[in-house]
């Protein structure tokens, strides 16, 4: 009798953390570009001529992000003024980052609650 050999190949996504790290790295090194017409085709070139041309692997953008610190209804940005922040956090919810250098006021609140504790 004959025997069969089966070979199965499939592609799998790398771990989510790895994908996130690669995207963050690309985001941090992204280049602002503009369209230029070369003959009958449009090409993307760095807006700042001192930057090297991008590759197919690079992340590029045409428009800068709005300033999320300031209120701008035209762009749907509510701003960060008046929001609650976390004084001890260094992340995006932290006061240093969220308040955009405007400074911030701190309030210390003590909450007294009744509980059904039994000793």
From Swiss-Prot:
Covalent lipidation (O-palmitoleoyl serine), chain numbering: 1
Subcellular location, record wording: Secreted, Extracellular space, Extracellular matrix
Glycan attachment sites: 86
Keywords, ordered alphabetically: Developmental protein, Disulfide bond, Extracellular matrix, Glycoprotein, Lipoprotein, Secreted, Wnt signaling pathway
Post-translational modification summary for this protein: Palmitoleoylation is required for efficient binding to frizzled receptors. Depalmitoleoylation leads to Wnt signaling pathway inhibition.
Primary site of residence: secreted
Highest taxon, organism lineage: Eukaryota
Entry GO MF terms: cytokine activity; frizzled binding
Gene3D superfamilies: 3.30.2460.20
An annotated GO BP: cell fate commitment
InterPro entries: Wnt, Wnt_C
Task performed by this protein: Ligand for members of the frizzled family of seven transmembrane receptors. Plays an important role in embryonic development.
Family per record: Belongs to the Wnt family.
Protein name: Protein Wnt-4
Gene that encodes the chain: WNT-4
């Amino acid at each position: 009798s004959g025997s069969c050999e089966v070979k199965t190949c499939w592609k799998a996504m790398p771990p989510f953390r790895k994908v996130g790290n690669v995207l963050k790295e690309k985001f941090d090194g992204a280049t602002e570009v503009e369209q230029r017409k070369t003959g009958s085709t449009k090409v993307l070139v760095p807006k700042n001529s001192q930057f090297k041309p991008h590759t197919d692997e690079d992340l590029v953008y045409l428009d800068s992000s709005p300033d999320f610190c300031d209120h701008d209804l035209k762009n749907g940005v509510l701003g960060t003024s008046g929001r609650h922040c976390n004084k001890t956090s260094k992340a995006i919810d932290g006061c240093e980052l969220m308040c955009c250098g405007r400074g911030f006021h701190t309030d210390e609140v003590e909450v007294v609650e009744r509980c059904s504790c039994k000793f």
